[in-house]
């Protein structure tokens, strides 16, 4: 039986659009040969071409991850890093590629005759790096070897595809291929990034905090393009992960079915994936840190950059996205995309696209989070929809994440009302995005939070002094005893035998205990442990936490324990920190599932819980 609580609630949504990144204003040559999206007058929304994936993602023969030519030693180190990441081994010493940086921050180059027609574009891409870092690109001369202490140089040529070697890898010529399809400013900037030592951004081990990789949509045999490295094998210099990095894959690279292979956890940021317009602020900061640019340029007398900005090679402030001004003093939270972010906790409510029922604006990105009490579910009903039509909803769309709000959801567009959406937990995320052209009326929807009355809490007591009772064997090495006092009341008693933790497992029987790996010592990094507790048909699982300690974060996105009460209903919390339910949790059916996930840093003691089979 469901008890639907209807309370008055209405959320008025204000107009919001995604702010363009701001920062140092430079004369950056813009890409002119990229395909333009046709206007509504010529296409009526039916023939538009989706945003193309970066050309550097198209696989070149012999290249790793599409466009990186690695030496045998580099490939061995990368494969070791990937194997270490998969096996959860401790990090190796960071060796990538400090010895392969360009000495004195000078990179000699030649443009071969085959690329003479692209020389202006290539020079513009090098200028872009020079304008924002302390790196200098110099035409190769006979004096370079004596000045720099090596004979290495990069050579641009018209090869087969878009690719580059990584770092200073050879003692003489080091080629960068700018093939016929690669004549784009951003693509050349990307390949130069590899030459100075950058790997792809999505290879970082902390990527799962920012993006989801959808291997189910990846072409068979191309999965290695999405492998992660260990921290010991990347050079991040404490620069935050950046979905807008010019070194990041786009959203549809290596797709087998036209669906995304990468999405951002924050759906408002999906449009930043694969940008090849210019270096991002994080790209610039990373280059300046690994080449120690601030040690070369004396900016000690320059005014301090505000709001996380930093000095470039010319002592100008480079500002984070949404900040501007000489010192990054302008903008900020009032113009950030988060302004179009709404959270609903009332039992009923209404959500609409910005400006509804008038047309929404171009380049809109909004998120609506709905959260109910633990154990509840959410039903979302669309009342009106008029959104630009495209088969896969790649232009404008409303997306509903009804299972895992950090994963990909189902997209809707056009004029057909979607079916009622029902969440599997107490959380649902709805996002709305639009592209740079063609707008419509948008959408209107209402939601109701539903309380499941079948989730009840029975009363139990834990005792540490075991009486003389019958001993039952459980699936783990600890021993528990069950004493029956009368048909309606049972007392669960636990021996003093320490519980032995595990990374997942299946637990059956009348009662037992589960614990995280190494408990009560700290668990390891990079874990995913699945625990299944199952009792006889017709009975329920009752779970009581005895101790709990996981890395704390507001949304539990780093380390977490997720509990599924069965029958598609999830307890609506990713538990973390030191707080846990004081009452017992009872499954909907005869099965309960726990999922422990940890990231690549910061540990805690984990958890231990007792379970038993009960009758309701």
Swiss-Prot record:
Q: Which GO terms describe its molecular function?
A: metalloendopeptidase activity; zinc ion binding
Please name the PROSITE patterns in this protein's record.
Answer: ASTACIN (PS51864), CUB (PS01180), EGF_1 (PS00022), EGF_3 (PS50026), ZINC_PROTEASE (PS00142)
Q: Which InterPro entries match?
A: Astacin-like_dom (IPR034035), CUB_dom (IPR000859), EGF-like_dom (IPR000742), MetalloPept_cat_dom_sf (IPR024079), Peptidase_M12A (IPR001506), Peptidase_Metallo (IPR006026), SPAN/blastula_protease_10 (IPR017369), Sperma_CUB_dom_sf (IPR035914)
Region Disordered, as annotated, extends over 30-67, 461-491
Q: Recite the UniProt keywords alphabetically.
A: Cleavage on pair of basic residues, Developmental protein, Disulfide bond, EGF-like domain, Hydrolase, Metal-binding, Metalloprotease, Protease, Repeat, Signal, Zinc
Location of the CUB domain = 340-450, 503-614
Q: Name one Pfam family in it.
A: Astacin
Q: Where is the Peptidase M12A domain?
A: 93-294
Disulphide bonds annotated for this chain are 134-293, 162-182, 299-317, 319-328, 340-366, 393-413, 503-529, 556-576
Q: Which residues form the propeptide?
A: 17-93
- Provide the residue positions that the database annotates as binding Zn(2+): 190, 194, 200
Task: List each copy of the EGF-like domain by range.
Answer: 289-329
- Listed name of the protein: Protein SpAN
Recorded name of the encoding gene: SPAN
The cofactors named for this UniProt entry are:
Zn(2+)
Q: How is the cofactor bound?
A: Binds 1 zinc ion per subunit.
Residues of the active site are: 191
Q: What is its EC number?
A: 3.4.24.-
- The leader peptide range reads 1-16
Q: Which domain of life is it from?
A: Eukaryota
Q: Please list the GO biological process terms of this entry.
A: proteolysis
